[in-house]
Amino acid sequence: MSTHLFTSESVSEGHPDKIADQISDAVLDEILKQDPKARVACETYVKTGMALVGGEITTSAWVDIENLTRQVICDIGYKHSDMGFDGHSCAVLNAIGKQSQDINQGVDRENPLDQGAGDQGIMFGYATNETEVFMPAPITYAHRLMERQAKVRKDGTLDWLRPDAKSQLTFKYEDNKIVGIDAVVLSTQHAESVSQKEVHEGVMEEIIKPVLPAKWLDKDTKYFINPTGRFVIGGPMGDCGLTGRKIIVDTYGGAARHGGGAFSGKDPSKVDRSAAYAARYVAKNIVAAGLADRCEIQLSYAIGVAEPTSIMLETFGTGKVANELLVKLVREFFDLRPYGLIQMLDLIRPIYRETAAYGHFGREQFPWEKIDRAAELSAAAGL
């Protein structure tokens, strides 16, 4: 019997890097509402008293960047100066330019199906049957802890909570099956007036216990709640935030490889984002079809070229058919050209702000989480 530990972390919507991601994706959504053909690469930087929104955007749309940025910050919960960051009064700086024509001529084509990739790059997709959402358990439950923190903060259950928080879970595996949770780490910003005893009890009773299945917790599970003992200064006052700096939190929590490209603020012509979504869609349908217990797929693209330059698939010894057959089925059932995958997943819609906190994968509301190809794949594989 082989045993191992595996750990993943998540961060809250009030974490500085996630504030930046949400602003960038809010800008993208507002532009896509008006101009489906827009080219958007929006980056945000937040620090005490300011938000800087920059990047390259080519569009016919008009967006009130300042007002939108303030709205996102306030929606997250930073709307009082006593939190160290206030969406009503912070400075909002705009440093947006246009996308290079050199890039544009390589992407746009007369025939949409010939649309080239917006950049070179490698993207990975992954799925596993260890949870009902075909995601690794450590990242799934780390996200759920952060969603719960936001819920009890916003509904007043724990009104001393503040927006900035982080979670980390260490799972125990035997022969690659979950047998329990070894360690729970949860750090949350809080009001200065609350005692550490109240923080520990509130977090345990209102966040940890409602989220983590009791069957995975035992007397040996270790809990680290605000282990530094105090977390009053948080958000952009504690750390600066930047778009695209939580790429492992956004994906599989380290359980699968990552091509390095961030998602937020990028329109679907950027394969960093759209092809990573398509790769997840492919991997999830393969696992849902029963063709493997775990599946990782790598795609690669060249700038200005429509067809992927490579497709690689790995099932870690869990495949029910040969990997070569799976690659053949992927090519047959999924159009992985940039325009093809945009159409396949209906990506030119204002759906991206919601992706920018609590993970891009394992959340059923997104189109790349559908398992509508599973039955066809299973039949084609002869299972």
From Swiss-Prot:
Its EC number is 2.5.1.6. It catalyses: L-methionine + ATP + H2O = S-adenosyl-L-methionine + phosphate + diphosphate. Its cofactor is Mg(2+); K(+). Binds 2 divalent ions per subunit. Binds 1 potassium ion per subunit. It is found in: Cytoplasm. It is an enzyme of class 2 (transferase). Mg(2+) binds at residue 17. One of its GO terms (biological process) is S-adenosylmethionine biosynthetic process. Its main location: cytoplasm. L-methionine binds at residues 56, 99, 239, 270. Keywords: ATP-binding, Cytoplasm, Magnesium, Metal-binding, Nucleotide-binding, One-carbon metabolism, Potassium, Transferase. K(+) binds at residue 43. PROSITE patterns: ADOMET_SYNTHASE_1, ADOMET_SYNTHASE_2. Residues 99-109 are annotated as: Flexible loop. Gene3D superfamilies: 3.30.300.10. InterPro entries: ADOMET_SYNTHASE_CS, S-AdoMet_synt_C, S-AdoMet_synt_central, S-AdoMet_synt_N, S-AdoMet_synthetase, S-AdoMet_synthetase_sfam. It holds the Pfam family S-AdoMet_synt_N. Catalyzes the formation of S-adenosylmethionine (AdoMet) from methionine and ATP. The overall synthetic reaction is composed of two sequential steps, AdoMet formation and the subsequent tripolyphosphate hydrolysis which occurs prior to release of AdoMet from the enzyme. Homotetramer; dimer of dimers. Belongs to the AdoMet synthase family. This is S-adenosylmethionine synthase. It comes from Actinobacillus succinogenes (strain ATCC 55618 / DSM 22257 / CCUG 43843 / 130Z). The lineage of its organism: Bacteria, Pseudomonadati, Pseudomonadota, Gammaproteobacteria, Pasteurellales.
